[in-house]
A protein has these predicted regions:
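Cell-envelope/extracellular polymer assembly enzymes that use nucleotide-activated donors
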Residues: 1-4, 32, 191
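Acidic helix N-cap motif at the loop->helix transition within catalytic regions
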Residues: 17, 31, 42-51, 57, ...
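Donor-binding/catalytic cores of nucleotide-activated saccharide
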Residues: 90-204, 213-230, 249
Length: 347
């Protein structure tokens, strides 16, 4: 069997049918789909059963309690029997030729891992205005490279996207490395992908929008951040820092620079989220940390947030802000904090 597609589903009654129909209508049929129902509280399970009725390529696993995206994906991985594994969120779907295009490129280049593109669509104008992301505009990276070299090239061209849904990888490679998603955190994709990057030997990028990404109300991407978001990013950045410190001598200078930049950027995102969270929630979170965790959080996230706060405060009392030119007169030092800088490893 060529592909195992793990679909995590939690309270997606309105969307899961379209998701699974996109698999049933694929032009390439050598796949299995493992749908993991994460103890949904709506009609998701009934919608799954209706969508897959009579199709033996689909299997349903139901978790006994709501355990989160990491646990759902890990359960699907454990049951997967395909040569390559993919992850599809239950409110998204694939283009009709997605698996065929992936199989052709994997076969042509004998790949271990293949990145591919996405297109975002929005359920409302408000969502498009507030959460716009230009997934389609990504510079192509040609050729076949080892994992670390491909990562450097993708960071350099801004083509890198830390999402488990935007690549397919050999299942045997994941099993050999013992890679699984870290339970109990949000933004688990980032850590999993950064742990995976060093291992594949033959990697390519198919810059086609094969993944259709839905932006909707109530998803992780569109809801106001909480300390769970901050925690997930902080844990991810800390694990990345520890890994880089232990293994930097094994990789090129360019790779280490790119990896360090992504680690720093992950912390910056966590710090920016703090600006939207009530101080009482931050205090309650800090109270629950161990001494070691508190030190790391205060040094790397809270301290960065305070530094960023001074810049924001200076900006908001500036003349340009008061007269309403916020969009055209942002000081350069704020841009450096708010925008994601371009990685330039090796330059």
């Amino acid at each position: 069997m060529r592909f195992s597609i793990v679909v995590a589903a939690y309270n997606v009654e309105r969307y899961i049918g379209e998701c699974l129909e996109s698999l049933k209508s694929q032009s390439f049929g050598d796949f299995e789909c493992i749908v993991v129902n994460d103890c949904s509280q709506d009609g998701t399970l009934d919608a799954i059963d209706r969508a897959i009725a009579g199709d033996g390529r689909f299997t349903v696993l139901t978790l006994e309690r709501n355990s989160g995206l990491s646990a759902a994906r890990n359960a699907g991985m454990a049951a997967a029997a395909g040569e390559f594994i993919m992850f599809l969120d239950g409110d998204d779907y694939y283009a009709p030729e997605a698996l065929e295009r992936l199989d052709a490129r994997i076969t042509a280049d004998n790949l271990d891992m293949l990145y591919f593109g996405a297109a975002s669509f929005y359920e409302s104008r408000k969502l498009r205005r507030e959460h716009y992301e230009n997934q389609e505009v990504r510079e192509s990276v040609g050729g076949v490279h080892c994992g670390p070299d491909m990562y450097v090239l993708m960071e350099r061209t801004k083509a890198f996207r830390p999402s488990a849904c935007l690549y397919t990888v050999r299942k045997a490679l994941l099993d050999t490395c013992g890679l699984r998603f870290l339970d109990g955190i949000l933004h688990e994709d980032v850590l999993f992908q950064m742990q995976l990057i060093p291992h594949p030997q033959r990697v390519a990028f198919l810059n086609e929008p094969l993944y259709q990404r839905r932006m909707r109300e109530g998803s992780i991407m569109t809801t106001r951040p909480t300390m769970r978001n901050v925690h997930g990013l902080a844990v991810t950045a800390q694990r990345m820092q520890e890994w880089l410190a232990a293994h930097a001598g094994e990789y090129s200078r360019e790779f280490c620079e790119a990896y360090a930049w992504r680690t720093s950027d992950t912390r910056e995102v966590a710090a920016r989220y703090l600006r939207e969270i009530d101080e009482a929630d931050v205090a309650a979170y800090r109270k629950g940390l161990s001494v070691e965790e508190l030190a790391a959080f205060d040094l790397h996230v809270l301290g960065l947030w305070r530094s960023m706060g001074h810049v924001y405060d200076e900006y908001e009392t500036s003349h340009a802000y008061r007269i309403g030119h916020a969009l055209i007169a942002i000081p350069q030092k704020i841009r450096k904090l708010v925008e994601l800088p371009q990685a330039k490893p090796g330059e």
